[in-house]
Amino acid sequence: MSGARCRTLYPFSGERHGQGLRFAAGELITLLQVPDGGWWEGEKEDGLRGWFPASYVQLLEKPGMVPPPPGEESQTVILPPGWQSYLSPQGRRYYVNTTTNETTWERPSSSPGIPASPGSHRSSLPPTVNGYHASGTPAHPPETAHMSVRKSTGDSQNLGSSSPSKKQSKENTITINCVTFPHPDTMPEQQLLKPTEWSYCDYFWADKKDPQGNGTVAGFELLLQKQLKGKQMQKEMSEFIRERIKIEEDYAKNLAKLSQNSLASQEEGSLGEAWAQVKKSLADEAEVHLKFSAKLHSEVEKPLMNFRENFKKDMKKCDHHIADLRKQLASRYASVEKARKALTERQRDLEMKTQQLEIKLSNKTEEDIKKARRKSTQAGDDLMRCVDLYNQAQSKWFEEMVTTTLELERLEVERVEMIRQHLCQYTQLRHETDMFNQSTVEPVDQLLRKVDPAKDRELWVREHKTGNIRPVDMEI
Protein backbone atom coordinates (compact mmCIF):
# COMPACT_ATOMS: atom_id res chain seq x y z
CA MET A 1 0.00 0.00 0.00
CA SER A 2 3.06 2.23 0.21
CA GLY A 3 2.74 4.99 -2.37
CA ALA A 4 -1.04 5.09 -2.14
CA ARG A 5 -2.77 8.33 -1.30
CA CYS A 6 -5.34 9.13 1.31
CA ARG A 7 -7.47 12.05 2.39
CA THR A 8 -7.61 13.16 6.03
CA LEU A 9 -11.00 12.88 7.71
CA TYR A 10 -10.25 14.68 10.97
CA PRO A 11 -7.71 17.28 12.08
CA PHE A 12 -4.69 15.91 13.97
CA SER A 13 -2.27 18.11 15.92
CA GLY A 14 0.47 15.55 16.54
CA GLU A 15 1.54 17.58 19.58
CA ARG A 16 1.88 14.59 21.88
CA HIS A 17 3.91 12.54 19.44
CA GLY A 18 7.57 13.18 18.77
CA GLN A 19 7.20 12.40 15.06
CA GLY A 20 3.50 13.23 14.63
CA LEU A 21 2.30 14.71 11.33
CA ARG A 22 0.06 17.73 11.83
CA PHE A 23 -2.80 18.16 9.37
CA ALA A 24 -6.30 19.53 8.97
CA ALA A 25 -9.34 17.72 7.63
CA GLY A 26 -9.40 17.31 3.86
CA GLU A 27 -5.64 17.25 3.18
CA LEU A 28 -3.95 14.73 0.86
CA ILE A 29 -1.19 12.47 2.17
CA THR A 30 1.08 10.04 0.33
CA LEU A 31 1.65 6.88 2.39
CA LEU A 32 5.26 5.88 3.11
CA GLN A 33 4.80 3.07 5.65
CA VAL A 34 1.64 1.21 6.66
CA PRO A 35 2.68 -1.23 9.42
CA ASP A 36 0.22 -3.03 11.68
CA GLY A 37 -0.71 -1.31 14.90
CA GLY A 38 -2.94 1.52 13.67
CA TRP A 39 -0.23 4.14 12.93
CA TRP A 40 0.97 5.04 9.42
CA GLU A 41 3.76 7.23 8.12
CA GLY A 42 3.00 9.66 5.34
CA GLU A 43 4.11 12.80 3.53
CA LYS A 44 1.96 15.85 2.88
CA GLU A 45 2.05 17.85 -0.34
CA ASP A 46 4.25 20.48 1.34
CA GLY A 47 6.92 17.81 2.01
CA LEU A 48 6.31 17.38 5.74
CA ARG A 49 6.58 13.79 6.96
CA GLY A 50 5.37 12.09 10.11
CA TRP A 51 3.17 9.47 11.76
CA PHE A 52 -0.58 9.65 12.31
CA PRO A 53 -3.50 7.37 13.32
CA ALA A 54 -4.69 5.31 10.37
CA SER A 55 -8.29 5.84 11.44
CA TYR A 56 -7.96 9.59 10.78
CA VAL A 57 -7.68 9.11 7.02
CA GLN A 58 -9.59 7.50 4.18
CA LEU A 59 -7.75 5.67 1.41
CA LEU A 60 -8.53 6.78 -2.10
CA GLU A 61 -9.71 4.04 -4.45
CA LYS A 62 -6.49 3.96 -6.45
CA PRO A 63 -2.99 5.33 -5.82
CA GLY A 64 -2.86 8.85 -7.16
CA MET A 65 -6.63 9.23 -7.42
CA VAL A 66 -7.73 12.62 -6.04
CA PRO A 67 -11.38 13.60 -5.77
CA PRO A 68 -12.00 16.89 -7.59
CA PRO A 69 -12.32 19.95 -5.39
CA PRO A 70 -15.67 21.69 -4.95
CA GLY A 71 -16.92 23.29 -8.14
CA GLU A 72 -14.51 21.45 -10.43
CA GLU A 73 -17.11 19.02 -11.77
CA SER A 74 -18.72 21.85 -13.69
CA GLN A 75 -15.67 21.83 -15.95
CA THR A 76 -16.36 18.28 -17.11
CA VAL A 77 -20.11 17.91 -16.57
CA ILE A 78 -22.35 20.63 -17.98
CA LEU A 79 -24.75 21.91 -15.33
CA PRO A 80 -27.80 24.10 -15.90
CA PRO A 81 -27.20 27.86 -15.55
CA GLY A 82 -26.88 29.00 -11.95
CA TRP A 83 -25.88 25.59 -10.51
CA GLN A 84 -22.59 24.79 -8.77
CA SER A 85 -21.37 21.44 -7.41
CA TYR A 86 -19.58 20.83 -4.09
CA LEU A 87 -18.17 17.87 -2.14
CA SER A 88 -19.28 17.06 1.38
CA PRO A 89 -16.49 16.12 3.84
CA GLN A 90 -17.50 12.49 3.25
CA GLY A 91 -16.83 12.84 -0.48
CA ARG A 92 -20.45 12.89 -1.67
CA ARG A 93 -21.26 15.53 -4.29
CA TYR A 94 -24.20 17.87 -3.91
CA TYR A 95 -25.45 20.84 -5.91
CA VAL A 96 -26.41 24.43 -5.04
CA ASN A 97 -28.49 26.81 -7.14
CA THR A 98 -26.83 30.19 -6.71
CA THR A 99 -30.04 31.96 -7.71
CA THR A 100 -32.65 30.21 -5.58
CA ASN A 101 -30.29 28.83 -2.89
CA GLU A 102 -31.79 25.36 -3.49
CA THR A 103 -29.51 22.49 -2.47
CA THR A 104 -29.88 18.89 -3.65
CA TRP A 105 -27.98 15.61 -3.70
CA GLU A 106 -29.22 14.85 -7.25
CA ARG A 107 -27.46 16.36 -10.25
CA PRO A 108 -29.88 18.79 -11.89
CA SER A 109 -30.72 18.24 -15.54
CA SER A 110 -30.57 20.88 -18.22
CA SER A 111 -34.37 20.85 -18.40
CA PRO A 112 -35.98 22.90 -15.62
CA GLY A 113 -37.84 20.84 -13.03
CA ILE A 114 -36.59 17.44 -14.32
CA PRO A 115 -34.13 15.51 -12.10
CA ALA A 116 -31.03 13.95 -13.61
CA SER A 117 -32.23 10.44 -12.72
CA PRO A 118 -35.75 9.44 -13.86
CA GLY A 119 -38.07 8.79 -10.95
CA SER A 120 -35.62 10.09 -8.36
CA HIS A 121 -36.83 12.49 -5.71
CA ARG A 122 -34.83 15.67 -5.28
CA SER A 123 -33.77 16.25 -1.69
CA SER A 124 -33.81 20.03 -1.76
CA LEU A 125 -33.42 22.47 1.09
CA PRO A 126 -36.21 24.48 2.68
CA PRO A 127 -36.41 28.16 1.71
CA THR A 128 -33.50 30.25 2.84
CA VAL A 129 -33.57 33.53 4.69
CA ASN A 130 -30.82 36.00 3.92
CA GLY A 131 -28.63 33.26 2.56
CA TYR A 132 -29.09 30.96 5.58
CA HIS A 133 -31.03 27.73 5.88
CA ALA A 134 -33.36 27.07 8.78
CA SER A 135 -30.50 25.37 10.61
CA GLY A 136 -28.42 28.52 10.50
CA THR A 137 -25.95 27.13 7.95
CA PRO A 138 -24.98 29.11 4.85
CA ALA A 139 -26.70 28.32 1.57
CA HIS A 140 -23.34 28.63 -0.21
CA PRO A 141 -20.93 26.40 1.72
CA PRO A 142 -17.35 27.61 2.05
CA GLU A 143 -14.79 25.20 0.66
CA THR A 144 -12.94 25.00 3.97
CA ALA A 145 -15.84 23.86 6.16
CA HIS A 146 -14.70 22.45 9.53
CA MET A 147 -15.59 18.80 9.87
CA SER A 148 -17.10 17.34 13.03
CA VAL A 149 -14.94 14.93 15.02
CA ARG A 150 -17.06 11.89 14.26
CA LYS A 151 -15.62 8.78 12.75
CA SER A 152 -17.21 7.59 9.47
CA THR A 153 -20.82 8.73 9.71
CA GLY A 154 -22.18 8.41 6.22
CA ASP A 155 -22.94 10.80 3.37
CA SER A 156 -26.01 12.44 4.83
CA GLN A 157 -24.75 13.33 8.31
CA ASN A 158 -24.41 16.84 9.63
CA LEU A 159 -21.83 18.49 7.38
CA GLY A 160 -20.98 21.38 9.67
CA SER A 161 -21.22 24.53 7.59
CA SER A 162 -22.43 22.65 4.50
CA SER A 163 -25.36 20.81 6.09
CA PRO A 164 -28.25 20.13 3.66
CA SER A 165 -30.83 20.79 6.38
CA LYS A 166 -31.41 20.84 10.10
CA LYS A 167 -33.99 18.07 9.85
CA GLN A 168 -31.60 15.79 8.00
CA SER A 169 -28.85 16.56 10.54
CA LYS A 170 -31.16 15.71 13.41
CA GLU A 171 -32.09 12.42 11.77
CA ASN A 172 -28.49 11.33 11.27
CA THR A 173 -26.89 12.44 14.52
CA ILE A 174 -27.85 12.33 18.17
CA THR A 175 -26.30 14.27 21.04
CA ILE A 176 -25.94 12.48 24.37
CA ASN A 177 -24.47 14.38 27.32
CA CYS A 178 -23.17 17.03 24.91
CA VAL A 179 -21.32 14.49 22.71
CA THR A 180 -22.58 14.01 19.16
CA PHE A 181 -22.92 10.46 17.81
CA PRO A 182 -24.38 8.98 14.62
CA HIS A 183 -28.08 8.24 15.03
CA PRO A 184 -28.54 4.52 15.86
CA ASP A 185 -31.32 4.17 13.26
CA THR A 186 -29.16 5.45 10.40
CA MET A 187 -25.68 4.70 11.72
CA PRO A 188 -23.41 3.16 9.09
CA GLU A 189 -20.86 0.56 10.09
CA GLN A 190 -17.89 2.24 11.74
CA GLN A 191 -14.32 1.04 11.38
CA LEU A 192 -12.69 0.50 14.78
CA LEU A 193 -9.46 2.37 15.43
CA LYS A 194 -7.77 -0.93 16.37
CA PRO A 195 -10.04 -3.58 14.84
CA THR A 196 -7.85 -6.56 15.74
CA GLU A 197 -7.76 -5.72 19.47
CA TRP A 198 -10.19 -5.05 22.28
CA SER A 199 -8.60 -1.65 22.70
CA TYR A 200 -9.63 0.96 25.25
CA CYS A 201 -9.73 3.60 22.50
CA ASP A 202 -12.67 1.88 20.75
CA TYR A 203 -15.14 0.99 23.50
CA PHE A 204 -15.43 3.87 26.00
CA TRP A 205 -16.85 6.83 24.08
CA ALA A 206 -20.31 6.86 25.63
CA ASP A 207 -21.31 7.39 29.26
CA LYS A 208 -22.63 4.54 31.38
CA LYS A 209 -25.47 4.62 33.86
CA ASP A 210 -24.19 4.75 37.41
CA PRO A 211 -25.41 1.56 39.17
CA GLN A 212 -25.21 3.36 42.53
CA GLY A 213 -27.28 6.38 41.51
CA ASN A 214 -29.35 8.08 38.85
CA GLY A 215 -26.41 9.78 37.16
CA THR A 216 -23.93 8.57 34.58
CA VAL A 217 -20.25 7.69 34.62
CA ALA A 218 -18.03 8.70 31.71
CA GLY A 219 -16.32 5.88 29.85
CA PHE A 220 -12.96 7.47 30.60
CA GLU A 221 -13.83 7.46 34.31
CA LEU A 222 -14.30 3.68 34.17
CA LEU A 223 -10.81 3.34 32.69
CA LEU A 224 -9.36 5.51 35.45
CA GLN A 225 -11.14 3.44 38.09
CA LYS A 226 -9.58 0.30 36.61
CA GLN A 227 -6.14 1.90 36.73
CA LEU A 228 -6.59 2.91 40.37
CA LYS A 229 -7.96 -0.53 41.21
CA GLY A 230 -4.87 -2.04 39.58
CA LYS A 231 -2.68 0.17 41.78
CA GLN A 232 -4.62 -0.99 44.85
CA MET A 233 -4.25 -4.65 43.83
CA GLN A 234 -0.51 -4.11 43.41
CA LYS A 235 -0.36 -2.59 46.91
CA GLU A 236 -2.29 -5.51 48.41
CA MET A 237 0.01 -8.00 46.70
CA SER A 238 2.95 -6.21 48.30
CA GLU A 239 1.25 -6.46 51.70
CA PHE A 240 0.64 -10.16 51.09
CA ILE A 241 4.33 -10.74 50.39
CA ARG A 242 5.14 -8.78 53.56
CA GLU A 243 3.00 -11.20 55.56
CA ARG A 244 4.81 -14.07 53.85
CA ILE A 245 8.13 -12.53 54.89
CA LYS A 246 6.93 -12.22 58.48
CA ILE A 247 5.99 -15.89 58.53
CA GLU A 248 9.42 -16.82 57.15
CA GLU A 249 11.18 -14.70 59.77
CA ASP A 250 9.14 -16.16 62.63
CA TYR A 251 9.71 -19.65 61.28
CA ALA A 252 13.47 -19.06 61.08
CA LYS A 253 13.58 -17.75 64.65
CA ASN A 254 11.65 -20.74 65.95
CA LEU A 255 13.89 -23.16 64.05
CA ALA A 256 17.02 -21.52 65.46
CA LYS A 257 15.58 -21.66 68.97
CA LEU A 258 14.57 -25.29 68.60
CA SER A 259 18.03 -26.23 67.35
CA GLN A 260 19.43 -25.16 70.74
CA ASN A 261 17.06 -27.42 72.65
CA SER A 262 18.81 -30.00 74.84
CA LEU A 263 16.23 -32.74 74.50
CA ALA A 264 17.75 -36.15 73.73
CA SER A 265 21.24 -34.64 73.85
CA GLN A 266 22.52 -37.69 75.77
CA GLU A 267 21.85 -40.07 72.90
CA GLU A 268 25.07 -41.96 72.11
CA GLY A 269 26.74 -43.75 69.26
CA SER A 270 25.97 -43.36 65.57
CA LEU A 271 22.34 -42.59 66.37
CA GLY A 272 23.50 -39.82 68.70
CA GLU A 273 25.59 -38.34 65.90
CA ALA A 274 22.59 -38.46 63.53
CA TRP A 275 20.41 -36.82 66.19
CA ALA A 276 22.93 -34.04 66.70
CA GLN A 277 22.97 -33.46 62.92
CA VAL A 278 19.16 -33.23 62.93
CA LYS A 279 19.35 -30.36 65.42
CA LYS A 280 22.16 -28.69 63.49
CA SER A 281 20.13 -28.94 60.26
CA LEU A 282 17.44 -26.86 61.95
CA ALA A 283 19.92 -24.06 62.47
CA ASP A 284 21.03 -24.33 58.83
CA GLU A 285 17.42 -24.30 57.66
CA ALA A 286 16.72 -21.24 59.80
CA GLU A 287 19.55 -19.43 58.02
CA VAL A 288 18.10 -20.43 54.63
CA HIS A 289 14.69 -19.01 55.53
CA LEU A 290 16.20 -15.78 56.83
CA LYS A 291 17.98 -15.29 53.52
CA PHE A 292 14.76 -16.15 51.67
CA SER A 293 12.80 -13.53 53.63
CA ALA A 294 15.49 -10.91 52.97
CA LYS A 295 15.40 -11.58 49.22
CA LEU A 296 11.60 -11.50 49.23
CA HIS A 297 11.75 -8.04 50.74
CA SER A 298 14.34 -6.60 48.34
CA GLU A 299 13.35 -8.40 45.14
CA VAL A 300 9.56 -8.76 45.41
CA GLU A 301 7.85 -6.75 48.16
CA LYS A 302 9.76 -3.48 47.78
CA PRO A 303 9.49 -3.28 43.96
CA LEU A 304 5.76 -4.00 44.16
CA MET A 305 5.28 -1.31 46.77
CA ASN A 306 7.39 1.35 45.07
CA PHE A 307 6.25 0.80 41.47
CA ARG A 308 4.70 4.08 40.27
CA GLU A 309 4.76 5.86 43.61
CA ASN A 310 3.11 8.96 42.08
CA PHE A 311 0.60 6.98 40.03
CA LYS A 312 -2.50 8.31 41.80
CA LYS A 313 -1.29 11.88 41.39
CA ASP A 314 -0.60 11.30 37.69
CA MET A 315 -4.02 9.73 37.19
CA LYS A 316 -5.64 12.69 38.94
CA LYS A 317 -3.95 15.08 36.52
CA CYS A 318 -5.09 12.94 33.61
CA ASP A 319 -8.64 12.86 34.97
CA HIS A 320 -8.72 16.64 35.35
CA HIS A 321 -7.37 17.13 31.83
CA ILE A 322 -10.07 15.02 30.16
CA ALA A 323 -12.75 16.39 32.50
CA ASP A 324 -11.79 19.95 31.56
CA LEU A 325 -12.08 19.10 27.87
CA ARG A 326 -15.49 17.54 28.53
CA LYS A 327 -16.62 20.66 30.44
CA GLN A 328 -15.45 22.83 27.58
CA LEU A 329 -17.41 20.63 25.18
CA ALA A 330 -20.54 21.00 27.34
CA SER A 331 -20.06 24.77 27.38
CA ARG A 332 -19.71 24.86 23.59
CA TYR A 333 -22.83 22.73 23.21
CA ALA A 334 -24.80 25.10 25.45
CA SER A 335 -23.65 27.98 23.25
CA VAL A 336 -24.83 26.11 20.14
CA GLU A 337 -28.27 25.52 21.61
CA LYS A 338 -28.51 29.14 22.70
CA ALA A 339 -27.48 30.35 19.24
CA ARG A 340 -29.90 27.94 17.58
CA LYS A 341 -32.73 29.26 19.72
CA ALA A 342 -31.76 32.85 18.95
CA LEU A 343 -31.71 32.11 15.21
CA THR A 344 -35.18 30.56 15.40
CA GLU A 345 -36.50 33.65 17.15
CA ARG A 346 -34.86 35.99 14.62
CA GLN A 347 -36.26 34.00 11.70
CA ARG A 348 -39.71 33.99 13.28
CA ASP A 349 -39.49 37.74 13.75
CA LEU A 350 -38.38 38.21 10.14
CA GLU A 351 -41.19 36.00 8.87
CA MET A 352 -43.73 37.96 10.89
CA LYS A 353 -42.49 41.30 9.56
CA THR A 354 -42.48 39.92 6.02
CA GLN A 355 -46.13 38.96 6.42
CA GLN A 356 -46.89 42.43 7.73
CA LEU A 357 -45.28 43.89 4.63
CA GLU A 358 -47.56 41.79 2.43
CA ILE A 359 -50.58 43.11 4.28
CA LYS A 360 -49.58 46.75 4.40
CA LEU A 361 -46.72 48.26 2.45
CA SER A 362 -44.93 51.05 4.31
CA ASN A 363 -41.43 52.44 4.58
CA LYS A 364 -41.37 51.65 8.30
CA THR A 365 -42.18 47.97 7.67
CA GLU A 366 -39.48 47.73 5.01
CA GLU A 367 -36.97 49.24 7.43
CA ASP A 368 -38.04 46.78 10.11
CA ILE A 369 -37.54 43.93 7.64
CA LYS A 370 -34.01 45.11 6.85
CA LYS A 371 -33.18 45.23 10.56
CA ALA A 372 -34.75 41.80 11.11
CA ARG A 373 -32.83 40.43 8.13
CA ARG A 374 -29.54 41.78 9.52
CA LYS A 375 -30.30 40.27 12.92
CA SER A 376 -31.22 36.95 11.31
CA THR A 377 -27.99 36.97 9.33
CA GLN A 378 -26.02 37.79 12.47
CA ALA A 379 -27.78 35.00 14.35
CA GLY A 380 -26.87 32.61 11.54
CA ASP A 381 -23.25 33.74 11.73
CA ASP A 382 -23.28 33.24 15.50
CA LEU A 383 -24.68 29.73 15.13
CA MET A 384 -22.04 28.85 12.55
CA ARG A 385 -19.32 30.15 14.83
CA CYS A 386 -20.71 28.25 17.84
CA VAL A 387 -21.02 25.01 15.86
CA ASP A 388 -17.47 25.40 14.60
CA LEU A 389 -16.16 26.02 18.13
CA TYR A 390 -18.13 23.00 19.35
CA ASN A 391 -16.67 20.81 16.62
CA GLN A 392 -13.18 22.04 17.46
CA ALA A 393 -13.74 21.26 21.15
CA GLN A 394 -15.07 17.80 20.30
CA SER A 395 -12.14 17.24 17.95
CA LYS A 396 -9.70 18.10 20.73
CA TRP A 397 -11.54 15.85 23.19
CA PHE A 398 -11.63 13.04 20.61
CA GLU A 399 -7.89 13.28 19.95
CA GLU A 400 -6.99 13.44 23.65
CA MET A 401 -9.30 10.52 24.41
CA VAL A 402 -7.60 8.35 21.78
CA THR A 403 -4.11 9.34 22.93
CA THR A 404 -4.86 9.02 26.65
CA THR A 405 -6.78 5.73 26.46
CA LEU A 406 -3.96 4.18 24.46
CA GLU A 407 -1.55 5.41 27.15
CA LEU A 408 -3.73 3.86 29.87
CA GLU A 409 -3.74 0.66 27.86
CA ARG A 410 0.07 0.71 27.72
CA LEU A 411 0.29 1.41 31.47
CA GLU A 412 -1.99 -1.53 32.24
CA VAL A 413 0.09 -3.90 30.11
CA GLU A 414 3.22 -2.59 31.83
CA ARG A 415 1.70 -3.09 35.31
CA VAL A 416 0.57 -6.66 34.61
CA GLU A 417 3.94 -7.56 33.10
CA MET A 418 5.80 -6.05 36.07
CA ILE A 419 3.74 -8.04 38.59
CA ARG A 420 4.11 -11.21 36.55
CA GLN A 421 7.89 -10.84 36.50
CA HIS A 422 8.11 -10.30 40.27
CA LEU A 423 5.82 -13.22 41.03
CA CYS A 424 8.08 -15.32 38.81
CA GLN A 425 10.97 -14.07 40.93
CA TYR A 426 9.05 -15.19 44.02
CA THR A 427 8.63 -18.72 42.66
CA GLN A 428 12.30 -18.80 41.65
CA LEU A 429 13.37 -17.84 45.18
CA ARG A 430 11.01 -20.46 46.54
CA HIS A 431 12.62 -23.15 44.36
CA GLU A 432 16.07 -22.02 45.53
CA THR A 433 14.93 -22.21 49.15
CA ASP A 434 13.70 -25.73 48.62
CA MET A 435 17.08 -26.71 47.17
CA PHE A 436 18.94 -25.15 50.10
CA ASN A 437 16.62 -26.87 52.55
CA GLN A 438 17.32 -30.13 50.80
CA SER A 439 21.03 -29.54 51.23
CA THR A 440 20.57 -29.09 55.00
CA VAL A 441 19.03 -32.55 55.41
CA GLU A 442 21.49 -34.40 53.19
CA PRO A 443 24.07 -34.75 56.03
CA VAL A 444 21.28 -36.09 58.22
CA ASP A 445 20.41 -38.67 55.58
CA GLN A 446 24.04 -39.73 55.32
CA LEU A 447 24.40 -40.22 59.07
CA LEU A 448 21.09 -42.04 59.33
CA ARG A 449 22.29 -44.50 56.71
CA LYS A 450 25.36 -45.13 58.89
CA VAL A 451 23.41 -45.87 62.06
CA ASP A 452 24.46 -49.40 63.19
CA PRO A 453 22.84 -50.73 66.36
CA ALA A 454 25.44 -53.53 66.68
CA LYS A 455 28.34 -51.08 66.42
CA ASP A 456 26.66 -48.72 68.87
CA ARG A 457 26.19 -51.62 71.26
CA GLU A 458 29.85 -52.59 70.95
CA LEU A 459 31.06 -49.08 71.66
CA TRP A 460 28.75 -48.68 74.58
CA VAL A 461 29.67 -52.07 76.08
CA ARG A 462 33.38 -51.34 75.76
CA GLU A 463 32.89 -48.08 77.59
CA HIS A 464 30.51 -49.22 80.27
CA LYS A 465 31.19 -52.94 80.73
CA THR A 466 31.44 -54.25 84.34
CA GLY A 467 32.93 -57.62 83.63
CA ASN A 468 32.68 -60.47 81.22
CA ILE A 469 32.96 -63.37 83.82
CA ARG A 470 29.58 -64.97 84.07
CA PRO A 471 28.17 -66.33 87.33
CA VAL A 472 28.36 -70.11 88.08
CA ASP A 473 26.49 -72.43 90.44
CA MET A 474 27.38 -72.39 94.08
CA GLU A 475 29.17 -75.49 95.38
CA ILE A 476 28.33 -77.29 98.71
UniProtKB/Swiss-Prot annotation:
GO CC annotations on file: clathrin-coated pit; clathrin-coated vesicle; cytoplasm
Record carries keyword Thylakoid: no
Main location: cytoplasm
Biased composition (Low complexity): 108-120
Keywords, comma-separated and alphabetical: Chromosomal rearrangement, Coiled coil, Cytoplasm, Developmental protein, Differentiation, Neurogenesis, Phosphoprotein, Proto-oncogene, SH3 domain
SUPFAM superfamilies: BAR/IMD domain-like (SSF103657), SH3-domain (SSF50044), WW domain (SSF51045)
Name of the protein described by the UniProt record: Growth arrest-specific protein 7
